[in-house]
Amino acid sequence: MNDMNLFEAMYSQRSFTRFRPDPVPKEAIDKMIDAAIRAPNGGNRQPWEFIAITDPEVIAQVGGVYKDVWLNAMGHEAPPDETPAYKAARYLANHMPEVPAMILICAVHDGAAPTAPSSQDEPFVRGSQASSVWPVAQNLFLAARALGLGTRLTTAHLRGEQRVKDILGIPDHVETVMLTPLGYPRGNFGPTQRKPAVEVTSYNRYGNRVT
C-alpha cells in the first residue's frame, strides 16, 4: 500500500472490467473509505453510507441482479457492431457475480436540512444529499488507484434497486447511488485518453476558448 502522487493517480486511473481472483484485504477497503469520506459535501451533513461486499455469496446475489438488469436492458446477445466500450460493459455484466469485492455507495436521506425546513424543499435536499456522494466516489476511486486496485463506476443496478436493497437490508430512507466492483485488475493502469482540456474550457463566456 504505497502512497502515490495525486496527479499520477488522476492521470493513470482507469475503469476495469476484468479482475484477478485475489481477495481484497479489509485494510485496503477501510483505507479507501477513510479517504473517501474526506470529500466535500453539502452542509457537511456527510449523508453517505458504504456497504463493502466481500462475501462471495452476497457478491453473487448482488452481481446476479446487476447481470440480470443489464442484459435485460441491453440484450443478451451482442450486436455485430457493438463498440469496444459496450463489449467491456457486457463482459463486466456477465462476470459481476464473480468479482472479488464490491462497494455500494448510498445516500442517506434523513429529513430536511436546517436551511430548507419546508416540505416543498425536500426534492432540493434529497438532490443535495445524493450529489454529495459523487465527490466521495471519486475519492474512493483515487484511493483505490493508489493502492493498485481497480474500480469501475456503475449504476445499472438501479434498474433493480429494490432487489439489491432487499438482499443487503437497506432501509427505505437510504438511496443506493453507485456500485463499483473492486479488485486487483487484469490489465494496466493509464494513461487515459481524453479530449484536450482546451476543447472543453471557456474563459469568462461560453465558447471563448483561450489557447
Which residues does each PLM region occupy?
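Glycine-rich phosphate/pyrophosphate-binding beta-alpha loops
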Residues: 37-44
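C-terminal helix-cap and adjacent tail motif
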Residues: 9, 15-16, 176-211
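Short acidic N-proximal helix/loop "leader" segments that mark the beginning
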Residues: 1-34
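Small-aliphatic-rich amphipathic alpha-helix that forms the alpha element of a beta-alpha
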Residues: 36, 103, 109, 118-166
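Short, surface-exposed beta-edge/turn micro-motifs
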Residues: 47-48, 99-102, 177
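Short catalytic-loop micro-motif centered on adjacent basic/acidic residues
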Residues: 18-19, 49, 150-154
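A generic local secondary-structure boundary/capping motif
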Residues: 91-94, 166-170
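Glycine/small-residue-rich phosphate/adenosyl-binding loop
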Residues: 52-132
